[in-house]
Each structure stands twice: as structure tokens, then as C-alpha cells.
């Protein structure tokens, strides 16, 4: 028989930098999960990635205080800011000048990386989603 699921915990943790301090410790502690075991497993799984890259993780907590977790690809905004070489998006989207620009080739490359985590049927649909995200961050999309 399958284990009884107590709940799901969704967090965004920098790659290779999981530690028992907030937000990880309190979130896992509330469910009675082994915090250090999660930190070691997460850091081992993400050690090949760029340090500090934000990694969304979904932790499934079971009634016997065990857990499993799934890591996903970093958020679209992380890839868009990296492609445009900016630190943060525009605070006044549409009103002020654009804070940067991305090319269609860069968007297609990001869409290829994010394909399995995006809710799109094909790469073109994923590119259209990324165009919307880029515009809402104050980025201009140029051909190329």
C-alpha cells in the first residue's frame, strides 16, 4: 500500500545552498521532517548547477515523517534577467524606458531549457509565454 501523503511544501532554494535556516527549516519542521537529511540530499542533487541559481522544489511529506522531492528548472524571470544582463526588472512597466532587451534566439534557447516545466504544447507556445514575461518585466523583444 502507498504511503499516506500529509502535504506538499513548495520552496525556492538557491542551488547547493540549502541550510536549516528559514525558509527551509521552519517549513520542514512544521511537518516533522528531517531538515538536515533534506539539505544534504538537495545540495547533492544541485551541486552540478550554477551556485545560487534559484531552484523551485516540491517536497512531498508522508505520514511516517519521510519525504520525497522534485526539483524543477529555475523561474523564467531568472533566465530572462540573465539573458538581458540586468539585476532586476522594471518597477514601472510600460511607463518608463525599457530596462533591457532580449532576442528571439535567446527566448527560443530559454524555451528549449524550460520546455518540460512550462504548460505549453510546443516550443513556439513556450516562446510566446516568455515574450509575455519579458514584456511584463520591462524588457523589449528584438528579432535576431
Curated annotation (Swiss-Prot):
One of its GO terms (molecular function) is structural constituent of ribosome. CDD domains: Ribosomal_L11 (cd00349). The keyword rRNA-binding applies. Keywords: Methylation, Ribonucleoprotein, Ribosomal protein, RNA-binding, rRNA-binding. SMART domains: RL11 (SM00649). Gene3D superfamilies: Ribosomal protein L11, C-terminal domain, Ribosomal protein L11/L12, N-terminal domain. GO terms for cellular component: cytosolic large ribosomal subunit. GO terms for biological process: translation. Pfam families: Ribosomal_L11 (PF00298), Ribosomal_L11_N (PF03946). SUPFAM superfamilies: Ribosomal L11/L12e N-terminal domain, Ribosomal protein L11, C-terminal domain. One or more lysine residues are methylated. Part of the ribosomal stalk of the 50S ribosomal subunit. Interacts with L10 and the large rRNA to form the base of the stalk. L10 forms an elongated spine to which L12 dimers bind in a sequential fashion forming a multimeric L10(L12)X complex. Belongs to the universal ribosomal protein uL11 family. Forms part of the ribosomal stalk which helps the ribosome interact with GTP-bound translation factors. This is Large ribosomal subunit protein uL11. It comes from Gluconacetobacter diazotrophicus (strain ATCC 49037 / DSM 5601 / CCUG 37298 / CIP 103539 / LMG 7603 / PAl5).
